[in-house]
């Protein structure tokens, strides 16, 4: 029950409880689902390719704030999905993973271990200690959590086995990186001194086995699996961020004829289609209502 005070701002009611905030967040993502999951990654792919090919002027080419903003928007379905599940334990796991991701990236940049010698090829925004992008968790966390959620959906009851769940998630994380890194190298996000698989050293994937294992274990420790299953059941957009990933990086790999990474992106897309969660009604979205009004 409200306090009687006016809690409305520009037609938006300020939530009084976490339940209210969850409902409003869900409604916002649902109403903008197509724009977030499809339009943003397609526009992102075009602008990144235009930047890499020298078709955009300097103020726009690889603009780090545009990149961060677009990435953050594409993460909204995942953030909304896990928002009601973040309790003290999950919060501690996220803090630990944040510190770990900054730490291992800093070691990687300065020593070449565990990912191989590399440098950033473009400005990725504010840097922590001058070496690590401050926005790193926005890029890294979702890759692992999306893999974890996809495994829960695809394996069903088989995911109750800790060994099966964790190994399957780690394999999916590696699949994600086999799509991401070749595309990122192709557009010049980062440059490795020992290019091997589409410009990426095999050592990088060994490094991802390490960092991915730690991240998967922390997510498995921090989040209630039964709660995640319920949320996945009730929240059809929860894996839309992975849809965005497939469209964005699959498109970039296709442009540069990176056929193996593109095929792996298609495999991820097939896994998403298998979950039968993305045949949504455009008339439920703001974009659809604007087009068909």
From Swiss-Prot:
It is a multi-pass membrane protein. The keyword Ubl conjugation does not apply. Involved in the biosynthesis of the acyclic C50 carotenoid bacterioruberin (BR). Catalyzes the reaction that introduces hydroxyl groups to C3'' and C3''' of bisanhydrobacterioruberin (BABR) to generate BR. Pathway: Carotenoid biosynthesis. Keywords: Carotenoid biosynthesis, Lyase, Membrane, Transmembrane, Transmembrane helix. It catalyses: bacterioruberin = bisanhydrobacterioruberin + 2 H2O. PANTHER family: SLL0814 PROTEIN. The chain crosses the membrane at residues 36-56, 66-86, 89-109, 134-154, 171-191, 199-219, 254-274. Belongs to the BABR hydratase family. It is an enzyme of class 4 (lyase). Disruption phenotype: Cells lacking this gene accumulate BABR. GO terms for cellular component: membrane. GO terms for biological process: carotenoid biosynthetic process. It comes from the Archaea. It comes from Haloarcula japonica (strain ATCC 49778 / DSM 6131 / JCM 7785 / NBRC 101032 / NCIMB 13157 / TR-1). It is found in: Membrane. Its main location: membrane. This is Bisanhydrobacterioruberin hydratase. The gene is cruF. Its EC number is 4.2.1.161. InterPro entries: BABR_hydratase (IPR053540), CruF (IPR017823), CruF-like (IPR007354). One of its GO terms (molecular function) is hydro-lyase activity.
């Amino acid at each position: 029950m409200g306090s009687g005070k006016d809690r409305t701002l520009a037609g938006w009611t300020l939530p009084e409880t976490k339940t209210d905030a969850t409902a409003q967040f869900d409604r916002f993502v649902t109403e903008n689902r197509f724009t977030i999951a499809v339009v943003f990654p397609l526009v992102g792919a075009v602008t990144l390719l235009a930047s890499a090919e020298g078709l955009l002027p300097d103020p726009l080419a690889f603009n780090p704030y545009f990149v961060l903003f677009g990435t953050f928007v594409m993460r909204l379905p995942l953030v909304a999905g896990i928002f009601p599940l973040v309790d003290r334990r999950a919060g501690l796991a996220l803090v630990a993973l944040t510190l770990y991701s900054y730490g291992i990236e800093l070691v990687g940049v300065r020593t070449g271990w565990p990912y191989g010698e590399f440098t950033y090829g473009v400005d990725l925004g504010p840097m922590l200690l001058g070496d690590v992008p401050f926005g790193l968790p926005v890029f890294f966390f979702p890759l692992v959590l999306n893999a974890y959620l996809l495994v829960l959906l695809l394996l069903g009851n088989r995911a109750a086995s800790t060994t099966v769940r964790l190994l399957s998630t780690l394999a999916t994380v590696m699949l994600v990186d086999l799509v991401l890194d070749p595309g990122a190298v192709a557009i010049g996000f980062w440059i490795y001194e020992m290019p091997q698989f589409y410009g990426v050293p095999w050592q990088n994937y060994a490094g991802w086995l390490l960092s991915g294992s730690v991240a998967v274990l922390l997510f498995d420790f921090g989040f209630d699996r039964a709660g995640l299953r319920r949320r996945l059941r009730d929240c059809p957009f929860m894996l839309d961020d992975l849809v965005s990933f497939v469209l964005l990086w699959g498109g970039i790999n296709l442009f540069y004829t990176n056929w193996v990474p593109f095929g792996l992106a298609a495999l991820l897309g097939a896994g998403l289609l298998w979950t039968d969660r993305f045949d949504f009604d455009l008339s439920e979205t703001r974009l659809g209502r604007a087009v068909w009004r």
